Amino acid sequence: MTLSGQTMPLEARKCQSLTGRVRVPGDKSISHRALILGALAVGETRISGLLEGEDVLNTAKAMQALGAKVERRTDDNGGIAWSVRGVGTGGFATPEAPLDFGNSGTGCRLVMGAVAGCPIRAAFDGDGSLRSRPMRRILDPLELMGARVISQSDGGRLPLTLEGARDPLPIVYRTPVASAQIKSAVLLAGLSAPGVTTVIEREASRDHTELMLKHFGADIVSVAEGAHGRKISLTGQPELHGAGVTVPADPSSAAFPIVAALITEGSDIVLDDVMTNPLRTGLFVTLREMGASIEESETRLDAGEPMAQLRVKASRLRGIEVPAERAPSMIDEYLVLAVAAAFAEGTTVMRGLRELRVKESDRLEAAAAMLRAGGVAVEIAGDDLIVEGRGRVPGGGLVTTHMDHRIAMSALVMGCASDAPVKVDDIAFIATSFPDFVPMMQRLGANFA
């Protein structure tokens, strides 16, 4: 739905093949963190490849409201870079108005952590979707560190007002679920605390915050904890220094053209500079297990993050079982994986998807509804999603997006190879993470109308 209140429907029709070379937008997780740490650093941070979607732009506005200077610059060759002049650790100022994060749970929760370590008061708000999402798991550890929730909606939901700690306490905190957002909020609050703040995870979540904190000069150590977990220790009150950041292409965004190419006969595409951090590439591992042709080349590192060029060719996929412990490394990709499973031969079982129920929508139910709209046999058993692949998808249905960008893009990918067109009721929210999705897919050969 647009700002004027009008919906933006779109139909995807079967296309001949997808071919070409593109770079999907910059990684959303890295973009948020680069802006926030740049704002907490001393000096200038220059960011190239920043995702200029609504979610990230709302974080940039929040950093300005908290006292940092944020500018978008264009060089003589037309290249775009963002400049952030920070206020130093603990230096945020009280904002004059509520911080509005729109649809972005990541931006909102990370900034809550940063504010919790500063002696200020800030109000947090968002759109209807974000207001429905739980914040209590973020607020609980922040209150242990000395922050106070002054006002909140039912169950710790937005809108709420948070008062940061004047003297933040370092804590040892065991996350109740594998969540990079909980971990990151605690670490960002811990920047202002004397001593060592420690986060212990039973299942390792994405480690972008740890890598970027180190890039900005923080003293942070991460070691294995148990079979699959991590123990992260941050020494507080560092002086972070502005740094250069090149944002790699977002693997969660790359997932859509990748799956579209795999299921569309004759396709052969190349994606440049895609992040290949092993804590984010569960989808690539899973698709390869299903028989996908995904080749990596030109690998390199920037700010501790690995990236590579990916070549993807149409492939015959087969159904597999996806273990629950893989969920943290691909939590945002299950919707489009469900599309791949629908085009595979055989049954695909995706285990342990409870966290999908508290995303922008109940993505577990939404995934099943999307596939049923396309004529696919699908079942939810507890927290598991079971897809009966037949090698083809009839299509012909209407998919309701529930204001969720990933439902919209996944449904359009399904329509690229289904027998009959697939219609999406509203694509407006795609702009939160992948503003150029439709024209980029059309350049590759997608048939959207």
Curated annotation (Swiss-Prot):
Swiss-Prot/TrEMBL keywords: Amino-acid biosynthesis, Aromatic amino acid biosynthesis, Cytoplasm, Transferase
Any one Gene Ontology BP term: aromatic amino acid family biosynthetic process
Residues that hold phosphoenolpyruvate according to the record: 28, 105, 133, 181, 363, 406
Catalytic activity: 3-phosphoshikimate + phosphoenolpyruvate = 5-O-(1-carboxyvinyl)-3-phosphoshikimate + phosphate
Record localization: Cytoplasm
Similarity field: Belongs to the EPSP synthase family.
SUPFAM superfamilies named in the record: EPT/RTPC-like
Subunit composition and interactions: Monomer.
Name of the encoding gene: aroA
Gene Ontology CC: cytoplasm
Functional note: Catalyzes the transfer of the enolpyruvyl moiety of phosphoenolpyruvate (PEP) to the 5-hydroxyl of shikimate-3-phosphate (S3P) to produce enolpyruvyl shikimate-3-phosphate and inorganic phosphate.
Pathway terms, separated by semicolons: Metabolic intermediate biosynthesis; chorismate biosynthesis; chorismate from D-erythrose 4-phosphate and phosphoenolpyruvate: step 6/7
Entries under Pfam families matching the protein: EPSP_synthase
GO terms for MF: 3-phosphoshikimate 1-carboxyvinyltransferase activity
Main enzyme class: transferase
InterPro entries recorded: Enolpyruvate_Tfrase_dom, Enolpyruvate_Tfrase_sf, EPSP_synthase, EPSP_synthase_CS, RNA3'P_cycl/enolpyr_Trfase_a/b
Tree of life domain: Bacteria
EC number(s) recorded for this UniProt protein: 2.5.1.19
Residues that, per the record, bind 3-phosphoshikimate: 28-29, 33, 179, 181, 332, 359
Name of the protein in question: 3-phosphoshikimate 1-carboxyvinyltransferase
Catalytic residues (positions): 332
